[in-house]
Structure formats: C-alpha cells, structure tokens
C-alpha cells in the first residue's frame, strides 16, 4: 500500500518495478490516471502503462449542501452563482480529481463561476461543509447515502438515478449534460499474458458479484468491464474529459 499523490506514488512505483507474472496487481481509477499524466510533468507514470483487468464499479459525483442551506435545488445554487460570481465555494477531494473536473464541467454547462476548494481527501470535506466553511461540495454518491441526515443532494452526475438515492435527480434531468465520477478497477503490469489477465478477471467478477448488493446500498453503480472493453473505457473517458483537461492545460 503506497498512499500519496492521489495514487501517483503507487502507480509510478508499480510501473517501474512490478513484474508481469500475474501476482502483481494494483487498484486504479479514472479520471486520475488520465488527468495526472496530462497535467503534471512529474506524475511518474503513463496512462497507457497499465494492462486493465477489470473495472468493477462507478462512483458518481454528487453536488451536496448542508440540510440547513438556503439552496433547496440545483437551480437555487446556479442562480446564486450567476448573481455572485466566485462567491459560491465548492469543496472537493484533491486537484484535477473527479470532483474538481466535475466542478469545472458544471461551471461550463451552467455558465457560472465558482471557487473550487481542494481538500486532501473526501474526509476533510465533510466537516468543512458541516461547519459552513464552504457553500457546497462536489463529492461522491456514498457521501449522500452516509450523510443523508446532514446533507441535501442537489444532483447526481449519472446517466440515471442511483438506486440508493431514488429521490435525487440527475444533472441530465435538470438540463445539464454532466455525467462523471470515479471508475474504479484493477490492473496488471504491461506484458502480463492475456490468459493470465482473463483468469484474474474471472476471479474478480465472481468476487464482485458477492458484494454487489452492499455496493449498491452504499450508492455505487455497478459497471463491469473486462476483456477488450476494459482498455476501451480509458479511451472513452479520455475523450469525454478531453475538453476540460485541455482547457486546464492551456491555462497553466
């Protein structure tokens, strides 16, 4: 386990030292593995330096406010931001993370200016929102489930409503074509034989079935992707986030 750098510490060491023998595997996620190498010269790893085994779930972004917030709906929040540019503070986990990129996409889609406040992880965002230090948070769907008595979720960035949050509208329903979050999976080193990768994918698929009900209850969306589809997801999301990442890169 190698924490740090939003995954970059572990991923860079993995790509440098892991052997393609079927015994070296690592957890990874989108958009981190796309955004970091594109925006940071010192990321230490390459997006295409992994051999995906399986993507096992999707964690949609959610825009949440405290229960006593003046914002009852997404439109309330957007109207406030239009009247007071940059006054609307949105906390999130990290820089160039799924939370950060979704905040930028919301600004572009709604024509508003917000101030994104990066925290070291999801954990510190929660007391910041509870304490009124930020107006809202762009976080992940399990936060909406776990803190439903403390927070109001204005919208979820999924194609359809999340099973554990049936009363929360999607951004799409509200007129904003925003779908995003963190896709999580496991990968092997480049050079690992495909037969080995397929065998590992079978094992992970079976294990994931055993815990899928728990994941759904926590607010995750089950998205299985193995075989040829696994690397295709990276290409699809690289294209989906291309405009936002390109804008950030050009401004640096």
What label would you give each PLM region?
Residues 9-20, 82, 104-109, 123-137, ...:
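Short helices/loops that flank or line small-molecule/ion binding pockets
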Residues 16-24, 37-120, 124, 181-214:
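Hinge/capping helix and adjacent helix->loop/strand transition within the periplasmic-binding protein
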Residues 24-26, 62, 135-136, 153:
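Short, Asp-centered acidic motifs that coordinate Mg2+ and/or phosphate
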Residues 27-28, 119, 138-139, 156, ...:
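Short beta-strand and adjacent tight-turn residues that come in two discontinuous sequence segments
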Residues 31-41, 105-109, 131, 136-166, ...:
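A ligand-binding cleft/hinge motif common to bilobed small-molecule-binding domains
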Residues 58, 142-207, 236-239:
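C-terminal lobe and pocket-closing loops
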Residues 108, 112, 194-252:
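An extracytoplasmic/periplasmic, membrane-proximal ligand-sensing/linker region
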